[in-house]
């Protein structure tokens, strides 16, 4: 998370996870990259599942999408089918078991729920009538926008997308931007804690990253 804040999109964190797998677990770069790619794909699948579940449970809150129930059902079936295909493909191409893939998917969804809970807490502070199910629709869209390599740490993109979506629920853009910035500052604090753990972990350092570059 620390590296994601200072690099475009999610590239920084992914590169450092590949680096950590290469150094600590002695994996070759191809295997390490495939593991990180698998986790990223499962994360996106988890985000899509959260979005679909939230959309179904939020009732008429998001009529602006203008999607019929039959269209939503078809989307859900396609999403589940795609999930099965992705998991099967990953299982064939890697040594990851189905049980581990399921665990990774669940952990990815729980991680996304962290942002949802944080935004809900800040919304309650401002006395905003936003439900968890509504945030299950909004936050996945915000997440997908921020992982695009457009700005550093998704700064500006996160605020714009969140303000636009919350405006559709009648929330003032100024309050939406404040909540988004509070979420960003929360991520910075968590990232700094992660960085402290990272630099105190044996056999990890930026000098080793230079060694990898020389070998590649």
Residue spans of the language-model regions?
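Mid-bilayer segments of alpha-helical transmembrane spans in multi-pass integral membrane proteins
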Residues: 1, 5-11, 40-52
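Transmembrane helix boundary and interhelical junction motifs in multipass membrane proteins
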Residues: 9-18, 147-162
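Membrane-interface alpha-helices at helix entry/exit sites of multi-pass transporters
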Residues: 13-14, 26-41, 171-182
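Hydrophobic alpha-helical membrane segments of integral membrane proteins
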Residues: 16-20, 30-36, 46, 152
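Helix-loop junctions at the membrane interface of multi-pass solute transporters
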Residues: 18-24, 166-168
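Transmembrane alpha-helix boundary and packing residues in multipass membrane permease domains
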Residues: 19, 120-124, 163-164
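Short amphipathic alpha-helical face segments that pack within enzyme cores
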Residues: 37, 161-164
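Predominantly cytoplasmic-facing regulatory/coupling regions of multi-pass membrane proteins
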Residues: 47-48, 54-150, 157, 171-181, ...
């Amino acid at each position: 998370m620390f590296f994601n804040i200072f690099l475009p999109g999610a590239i920084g964190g992914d590169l450092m996870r590949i680096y950590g797998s290469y150094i600590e677990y002695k994996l070759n770069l191809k295997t390490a990259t495939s593991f990180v790619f698998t986790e990223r794909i499962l994360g996106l699948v988890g985000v899509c599942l959260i979005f679909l579940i939230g959309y179904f449970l939020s009732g008429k809150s998001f009529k602006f999408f203008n999607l019929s129930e039959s269209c939503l059902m078809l989307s859900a079936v396609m999403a589940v089918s795609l999930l099965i295909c992705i998991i099967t493909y990953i299982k064939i191409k890697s040594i990851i078991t189905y049980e581990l893939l399921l665990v990774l998917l669940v952990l990815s969804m729980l991680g996304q729920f962290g942002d949802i809970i944080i935004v809900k807490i800040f919304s309650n502070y401002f006395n905003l009538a936003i439900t968890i199910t509504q945030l299950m629709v909004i936050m996945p869209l915000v997440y997908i926008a921020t992982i695009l390599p457009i700005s550093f740490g998704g700064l500006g993109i996160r605020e714009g997308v969140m303000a636009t979506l919350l405006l559709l629920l009648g929330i003032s853009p100024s309050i939406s931007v404040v909540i988004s910035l509070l979420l960003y500052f929360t991520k910075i604090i968590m990232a700094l804690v992660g960085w402290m753990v990272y630099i105190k972990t044996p056999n990890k350092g930026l000098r080793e990253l230079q060694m990898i570059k020389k070998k590649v």
